């Protein structure tokens, strides 16, 4: 039984799920919006929101914590210098998920996840 087991497996093992989350979070924070499946977008949202909330601390420790999840120094710099100050007064809810239809090949629901 799955009582109390939050999160989705996405047909991947734990290291592949972590790699997927990091890669998509990096892309989202670099570009501002990405298109992915609805399920992946729903998994990505809390991951990115925690990164932004951590970055709002603004100190060296916060930068190092963000760098643990985002392995691209340019994106870490952007998060610390541009994204976090933008949301300084906002207590959460930094992302929005919009459904954009279905994928032609397999009919899965696609979504656009973007920074508000």
UniProtKB/Swiss-Prot annotation:
GO terms assigned for molecular function: structural constituent of ribosome
Pfam families named among the record's database cross-references: Ribosomal_L17
Superkingdom of origin: Bacteria
GO cellular component: cytosolic large ribosomal subunit
GO biological process: translation
Matches recorded under Gene3D superfamilies: Ribosomal protein L17 (3.90.1030.10)
InterPro entries, per database record: Ribosomal_bL17, Ribosomal_bL17_CS, Ribosomal_bL17_sf
Keywords: Ribonucleoprotein, Ribosomal protein
Family stated for the protein in its record: Belongs to the bacterial ribosomal protein bL17 family.
Oligomer status and interactors: Part of the 50S ribosomal subunit. Contacts protein L32.
NCBIfam families in the record: L17 (TIGR00059)
The protein's name in its UniProt record: Large ribosomal subunit protein bL17
Record organism: Deinococcus deserti (strain DSM 17065 / CIP 109153 / LMG 22923 / VCD115)
Gene: rplQ
